[in-house]
């Protein structure tokens, strides 16, 4: 039995190793349980046909679907929604799906024997369902919808019947596949990218059913028994499925992390752990975090949402043909602590200073040895952060993004790295990461510095490109962190030799997370709780919230947020908003909201979790704050807690009775606050 079963990522990181039945980590040549026999690690990697190296692996197509899903949540019209939903399906060409690549990527990290028949069944089923979804279901729904008029909301009867029938059939088929081919026993981890995408589509179909149930004459999902307590059987099915799908994705994501973590405590294990964490965040967890926005009972009008999590790419620069030797000698915890940041409020890079120094016997070649980051938080306060590298002396380059106030701060970099063996050092081999060129650009300007290592035998480290400059405006990520480490380790193959190197790690925010808390006059605005204006304790999120959580405990009982309108002259003090909090509570608590001294009544928050280790999807509840709020030109809200412990996911600002909304939409907004 896997001792990491049902453990969170934090527990897995801190857990003791499981050395029972652990296969050899390298080169897997003699282990009877290894995926490949009589070969080395590089050969085994090459078995995953079609995998090409990139900064985010081969999962860029799937990450693009997250953008479409976010855009769908913010879509103000049904017509736009049809176009966006249709575009999601277009990411899967008829002749080749991206899923075999992602399956191979996942399997390359967890190192389990692939059941190719299960993979073929799942990918074939998904491609078939997506074809039906796009060419039959969406077409029938659009054709019927276009015939509806206020006097006849049911539209053309024949088109209505075709739309009803195709909705019932595609909903049933996705539901069955998610319980069957997409979750086949023994392949759940490698199938997670397929499962998460299929679950996203199924929830969108249930959203359509909830929205058009009366006009289409829908009764209940096909094959689902009627329950007398369910006013809307499709809403009941939606709530059941969102919990089931979220729990499935998080459970098998944690299992995948556990399988990698149990291999050992060396750097190779960390490298693969971080890669699995990053790429599953991009293709699974990001989507899971967006599932709740499909609930039209909670989000009846367009919703602006943000993903505040950070992903860390592989350290820039390979380490020649000794990469495996180096990382087998490094410690997992050392790399985790120095190549990723501890939990803190949301922030962004303001400037970066790069430090270089000359290495002896290197013909005066410069190497990157450290960096110093100046970061800015939502409230305008700044802090300096450095990695494990050298940050003394005069920096050779400074990239400053401290332009303007309130503008999106997006940083784009193009980095080329290489390494070199330095001759002439007794009992020592040095491979130092050098930067051929470093460029960073933002709307406020760009920094550029180029320097090279001296001549000599060069190990092939390839080229790492991050958001090419010509495409930066369409980027879905921006640099939020930069960390450098310097280490010297003894070679496993020859303990008398020392191996020295430096490496650069980059952290990335999703572009949906802006640097200010901007509320929108005609949408529900979701503000991540980590975007507080004050330094405040944060804890690791459970995986399905799109970021970390703000911890309101006995030692820190106030969260403060400065707000800004997206378009000031459209708003007056007469426009009302309401506030809703999504949070989990350990013990019964109360919460109130203060807006420049005007406090709301206290609201009791029921206990939903016994401890941090027991947080589940159902642990999070929506707490509606009574009364309307009228924001002036510089609104500020504070969350105040009484005894108990609140873990806050996000704050939601909901417009009330704003003129672009239809009468029905205004009624839907009002219903959000009726207990």
Swiss-Prot record:
* Domain of life where this protein originates: Bacteria
Pfam family membership, one: Endotoxin_N
Instruction: Cite a single GO BP annotation.
Output: sporulation resulting in formation of a cellular spore
Supply the alphabetized keyword list.
Sporulation, Toxin, Virulence
**Which InterPro entries does the protein's record reference?**
Galactose-bd-like_sf (IPR008979), Pest_crys (IPR038979), Pest_crys_dom-III (IPR005638), Pest_crys_dom_I (IPR005639), Pest_crys_N_sf (IPR036716), Pest_cryst_cen_dom_sf (IPR036399), Pest_cryst_dom_II (IPR001178)
Molecular-function GO terms, alphabetical = signaling receptor binding; toxin activity
What does the similarity note say?
Belongs to the delta endotoxin family.
What the entry lists under PANTHER family is as follows: ENDOTOXIN_N DOMAIN-CONTAINING PROTEIN-RELATED, PESTICIDAL CRYSTAL PROTEIN N-TERMINAL DOMAIN-CONTAINING PROTEIN
Q: What else is known?
A: Toxic segment of the protein is located in the N-terminus.
Task performed by this protein: Promotes colloidosmotic lysis by binding to the midgut epithelial cells of insects.
Q: What is this protein called?
A: Pesticidal crystal protein Cry25Aa
**What's the source species for this entry?**
Bacillus thuringiensis subsp. jegathesan
């Amino acid at each position: 039995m896997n001792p990491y079963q049902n453990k969170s990522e934090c527990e897995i990181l801190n857990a003791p190793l499981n050395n029972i039945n652990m296969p050899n980590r390298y080169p897997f040549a003699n282990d009877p349980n290894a995926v490949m026999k009589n070969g080395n690690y590089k050969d085994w990697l090459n078995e995953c046909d079609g995998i090409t190296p990139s900064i985010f692996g081969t999962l860029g197509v799937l990450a693009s679907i997250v953008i479409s899903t976010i855009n769908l949540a913010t879509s103000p019209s049904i017509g736009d929604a049809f176009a966006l939903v249709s575009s999601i399906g277009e990411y899967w060409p008829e002749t080749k799906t991206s899923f075999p690549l992602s399956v191979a990527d996942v399997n390359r990290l967890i190192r389990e024997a692939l059941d190719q028949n299960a993979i073929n069944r799942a990918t074939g089923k998904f491609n078939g369902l997506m074809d039906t979804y796009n060419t039959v279901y969406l077409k029938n729904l659009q054709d019927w919808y276009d015939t509806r008029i206020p006097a006849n909301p049911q539209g053309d009867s024949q088109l209505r019947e075709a739309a009803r029938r195709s909705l019932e059939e595609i909903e049933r088929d996705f539901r069955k596949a998610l319980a069957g081919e997409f979750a086949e026993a023994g392949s759940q981890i490698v199938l997670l990218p397929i499962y998460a995408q299929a679950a996203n589509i199924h929830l969108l179909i249930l959203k359509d059913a909830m929205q058009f149930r009366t006009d289409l004459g829908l009764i209940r999902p096909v094959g689902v028994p009627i329950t007398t307590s369910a006013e809307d059987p499709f809403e009941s099915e939606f709530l059941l499925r969102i919990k089931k799908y979220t729990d499935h994705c998080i459970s098998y994501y944690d299992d995948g992390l556990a399988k990698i973590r149990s291999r050992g405590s060396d750097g190779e294990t960390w490298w693969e752990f971080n890669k699995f964490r990053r790429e599953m965040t991009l293709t699974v967890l990001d989507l899971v975090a967006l599932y709740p926005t499909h609930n039209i009972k909670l989000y009846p009008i367009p919703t602006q949402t943000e993903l505040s999590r950070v992903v860390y790419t592989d350290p820039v620069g390979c380490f020649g043909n000794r990469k495996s030797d180096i990382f087998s000698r490094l410690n997992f915890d050392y790399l985790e602590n120095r190549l990723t940041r501890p939990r803190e409020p949301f922030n962004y890079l303001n400037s970066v200073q790069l430090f270089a120094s000359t290495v002896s016997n290197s013909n005066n070649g410069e190497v990157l040895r450290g960096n110093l980051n100046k970061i800015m938080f939502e409230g305008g306060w700044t802090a300096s952060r450095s990695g494990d590298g050298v940050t003394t002396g005069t920096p050779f380059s400074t990239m400053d993004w401290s332009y303007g106030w309130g503008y999106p701060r997006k940083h784009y970099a193009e980095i080329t790295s290489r390494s070199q063996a330095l001759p002439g050092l007794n009992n020592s081999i040095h491979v130092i990461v050098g930067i051929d060129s470093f460029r960073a650009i933002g709307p406020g300007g760009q920094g550029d510095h180029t320097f090279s290592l001296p001549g000599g035998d060069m190990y092939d480290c390839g080229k790492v490109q991050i958001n090419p400059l010509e495409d930066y405006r369409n980027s879905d990520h921006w640099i939020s962190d930069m960390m450098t480490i310097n280490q010297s380790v003894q070679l496993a193959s020859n303990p008398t030799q020392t191996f020295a190197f430096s490496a650069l790690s980059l952290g990335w925010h999703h572009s949906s997370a802006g640097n200010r808390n901007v509320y929108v006059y005609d949408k529900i605005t979701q503000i991540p709780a980590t975007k507080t204006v004050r330094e405040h304790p944060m804890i690791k999120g459970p995986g399905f919230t799109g970021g970390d959580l703000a911890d309101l405990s006995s030692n820190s009982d106030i969260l403060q947020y400065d707000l800004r309108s997206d378009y000031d002259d459209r708003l007056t003090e007469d426009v009302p908003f309401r506030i809703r909090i999504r949070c989990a509570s350990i013990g019964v608590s109360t919460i109130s909201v203060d807006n420049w001294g005007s406090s709301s009544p206290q609201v009791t928050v029921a206990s939903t979790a016994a401890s941090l280790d027991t947080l589940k999807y159902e642990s999070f509840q929506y707490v509606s704050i009574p009364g309307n709020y009228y924001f002036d030109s510089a609104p500020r809200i504070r969350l105040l807690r009484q005894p108990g412990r609140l873990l806050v996911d996000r704050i939601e600002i909901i417009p009330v009775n704003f003129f672009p909304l239809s009468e029905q939409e205004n009624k839907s907004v009002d219903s959000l606050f009726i207990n």
